[in-house]
Amino acid sequence: MTENTAIIKIIDEITACRNITFEQLHMLLETDDMQAVDYLRKRASEKAHETYGNQVFIRGLIEFTNYCKNDCLYCGIRHSNTHADRYRLSTEQIMACCESGYELGFRTFVLQGGEDPYYTDERICEIVSGIKAKYPDCAVTLSIGEKSKESYQSYFDAGADRYLLRHETADEKHYSRLHPAEMSLANRKQCLWDLKEIGYQVGCGFMVGSPGQTVETLYKDLQFIKELEPHMVGIGPFISQKDTPFANEKSGTMDETLRLLSIIRLIHPKVLLPATTALGTIHPLGREKGIQSGANVVMPNLSPVNVRDKYKLYDNKICTGDEAAECRFCMENRMKSIGYQVVVSCGDYADF
């Protein structure tokens, strides 16, 4: 049996049993047989089509604060980065973003920010309930970090539907390489279990190519995803940011990110899987290639243009100067060019 035949057989096995062994993962990530890699992407794309057809769900991203109390080593808005130009959006500004987004057809708003103590539970609940009152046909997703179960419950009661919290790595040692000592993988995981128990549609995820990542740590990530059964998984390449301790670390690659997107689609066929902005940052057609590898969500930016460039988790981020309407229609045309249709809907998880 040639290597090509062996790998194709492995891809078919993973597709059939929705699981992957360490040896299979190792083989799929290490192979330089691009014919086999194309087959992996093709199978993942077919699997996404089975559930979602040629539809791509579009979410409006609102980055409402770049203050953060944490000091994660990879992140440009880390607490100790004195070069970050800090900002906060008022409730009125956030509502204005939603208003323009709603007019453009967005039916999911993703409120993302650093862990900023200024936004108390009361403030977050007020923002969420305000959006839900004005746009009852829209979903609200929060991505604001680690909170207590009580806090998560209060946001849910205010109307939040989904919560994104990347676990970043399921390996303890790797987690401590990426985060300060006061943060723990155990707490991060507990937050995800709490969110799921409350009733959110939950998203976890990780950076591809972060310092210290290995096939072993990636295998733990896939096992954790299998265990958690999240509704969404957000992965994108690690891209260094010049004002962080990882400034000189090399970035993750598009190739490895696409392979992992495809693998995640095969082991978790109905998952909502974004083709991220970071993927579009490392390659001009990164997001298109992500969709062709099994992803089915894109998240154009609805934040005011004057703050876009300040939300610098990593360097060279794309689309920071474009108006929301430009981003929306640019994305629609990009998806159309590869045979996909951007859908105006909440875009829930298939079985939710």
Name every feature range the model reports, one short phrase each.
Residues M1-Q35, Y102, K226-F352:
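Auxiliary Fe-S-binding modules of radical SAM enzymes
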Residues Y52-Q93:
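Canonical Radical SAM [4Fe-4S] cluster-binding loop centered on the CxxxCxxC motif
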Residues C17, A44, C72, L111, ...:
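Conserved, mostly hydrophobic/aromatic
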Residues T65-N66, E115-T120, A181, G209-T214, ...:
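Short, small-residue-enriched loops and turns at beta-alpha junctions
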Residues A36-F57, A295:
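Short, charged low-complexity linear segments at domain edges
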Residues G60, C98, C125-S129, Y152, ...:
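Generic structural signal for well-ordered alpha-helices
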Residues S148-Y155, P211-I225, T281-Q292:
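Catalytic cores of alpha/beta
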Residues H79-I94, G101-E122, V128, K132-L192, ...:
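Core AdoMet radical
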